[in-house]
Amino acid sequence: MHRGSRPGWRVVLSRLTDRPALLGGTAFAALLVSLPWTPALVVLVAGLWLVLGAPATLWYSISARGVSTRDGRVLVSIGLTVLTAILLALLVNTALPAIGAPHPLTRLPLGAGMLLVVTGLATAAPITGRWTWSRLAVPAGAGPVLLLGAAAIILAVAGATRLNNGLSGAVSVVALLAVAALLIVLFRRRERHSSTVTGLGLVLAAAAVLLLNSLRGWFITGHDIQLEYEVFRLTDNLDRWDISAFREPYNACLSINLLPVLLSRLTGIPGEYVFKAVFPLLFALTPVLVYRSVRNVASQAIALLSAMYFMAFPTFFTDMTFMARQEIAFLLLGCVMVVITDAARPLRARRPLVLVLLLGIVLSHYSTTYLVLVTFGIALGIDYGGRLVRRVRSRPPTGTTGFVTWWMIALVAVGAVAWTGPATDTGGQVRVTVAATVGNLLGKSSATGSSDTRYSLFGGAAVSAEQRLRDYVAFTEQQTGAERASGALLPLPVLAGHPMSVVPESAMPLTGFGALLDRIGVNVPGFNGLVRQAAAGVLQLLLLVGLVAATFARRRTFRAPPDQIRLTTGALVLLGVLTVLPQLSVDYGVLRAFQQGLIFFAPFVAAASVWSFRWTTTRLSVRLAFGLVMALFLDLTGVVPTLLGGYPAQLQLANSGQYYDIYYVHPEDRSAARWLGERTSATDVRDTFPTLVRTDSYVLLSYATVHKGEATAFYRGDAMTYRYPFGVLDATKNKIYSSDGAAIYR
């Protein structure tokens, strides 16, 4: 029994790793899933066991060859299970049409396929074949953590539901405070909690934070997820994945077509909630993976702080739930780091496991693959460079072998090229990005990068929203000149008579407490903005300090293994490149890259936060570091700005703000789209930006545009909110549909 566990009840149990019982239970689950009259709840339970439970149980046993810790094996087994589901769906989708079955992605073949996969895994898993007596033991401290975590999740679901019903975000704020309370408990009792309990607390905290955002709206809400869901629907409606039906990079990400189709078919969960709930819950494991990978090489405090920094970064709770393909890719990348840092297992067992996980990332998300390849390539170059320097200086080798090898990078690169090339022919965007980047480097072209670079210590020119709008108008006019001359687009003189202007992002009114601070001389809006800008600088500064301190300082908070130092250096160099090369900052996103980088360098940020308080006692420095990350968490998640006012609202806490106006789908929007769909067979969807409106097109204006008179366009990775010129449509078209929240012109 684990130290600190409480005695349980002696019961007759079959171990989950009992081969006959496991296979029998899985076969029964496959049968229940296949029967048309099985109740929905039974299908849900049976399907979850068939898709996730049984494979994860077997992968837990198999992964012991490359992962030494129990909780590490649990986490890696889940990642391998997700990859198994993707590969099984791909195999079924490829094999059945070849033998005359045009609809392979239906419940019966998928269920039978999963049963065969489980049977195959059972033959490889080192499991028993007998019944045994076992004790059910509850780890010490699990009760309070479970109660607090469950309360946070319930509050998060209730908070999102209240907001969707038009009520206030007060419950959502309380949910975040409950998450903060849970994190405080995890920190205060960190030495008494086992890794299992700490991981349980982290996954519950992360799930609550993510569900606050993912459950917003009764329909699919967010940016990338809108197209991701359409890719899923295309595969779902065809009962088959066919890249030729939509030959775009999104459709080459099997994490958003084959995986959700399999999950929906075998569990009965509607596809909409696979994206809004299942994927966020899987992604909630990523902070735990960060914790486990750091715990392999550092103290409990550093590992816990690392996971908290990963959760406190804004992209985690504002954007990740809107990028399902990246959620799955980050889950697999977290598993990669758990295996890399687990030095208790031999390299010959860990390297093949990492290679399999990296190939899973290739199938899940293209840009994550490219960034990982560059990071690993830089790490390998540093390793080779270090060996060369030692050889030139006639110094003996260090005796340690780097984890990353040339053949590992080569195989992943070949896999990526093969997948985006011959297999799917979706590598066009990469070629465009490379060509534009080369043009930037050679001075043959100039362009502005994403405004996200303004948060970087590496620099990045700031471009005003007004200038960005003018640039976009000029760009669209240039691109459409020939069509406009033929009369296909609205004439420029009409557009010139109704100029557009940028609308500044509105801030929440000051609360009572915020007004009190204002009366005593505190500029609350300025304070909120300063804290946000300072937070970005603090995180980057901590990263730099942590990397230097872990490498050169005499008094080190933790001794980073060479592999982690090299990978962190690679990720840091990559961030610098993304910042200074405009096209890369637009196509791959600096903030997303930093979130990905935290999987590698979170321990350096955490260690630097402790090291920066080294002038105090050891115990106090850790507490102050925890206070810093908690302050960042409460401010960046929106708790502090909501309590003060004077800052733009965040989607997870309010029915206002930029994300709400742009991405929140209202019933009026759907009604207008449905009305239009019933009256036209046109499928060519264009932009409503005035310079792109065609003379013969329908123009559907959304709820936010009709109610606020504002619309948003995207250019060079930035959103530009502008005053919509209704006069253009009034002068050139007729209004044929009008409701309380949407309008259509023709």
Which positions does each model-derived feature cover?
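Membrane-embedded, hydrophobic transmembrane alpha-helices
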Residues: M1-H193, Q583
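Transmembrane alpha-helix segments characteristic
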Residues: A21-A30, V197-A207, V354, Q540-G546, ...
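Hydrophobic/aromatic-rich transmembrane helices and adjacent perimembrane loops
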Residues: L48, G169-A175, Q326, Y370-L371, ...
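Active-site lumenal/periplasmic loops and adjacent helix-entry segments of GT-C-fold
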Residues: V185-L331, Q596
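Membrane-interface helix-loop-helix junctions at transmembrane boundaries of multi-pass membrane enzymes
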Residues: R188-E191, L347-R348, L388-V404, G521, ...
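Membrane-interface transmembrane helices that cradle and orient dolichyl/undecaprenyl
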Residues: L333-R350
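Membrane-interface alpha helices of multi-pass inner-membrane proteins
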Residues: V339, P352-T369
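Extracytoplasmic
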Residues: R431-E505, P509, L516, N523-P525, ...
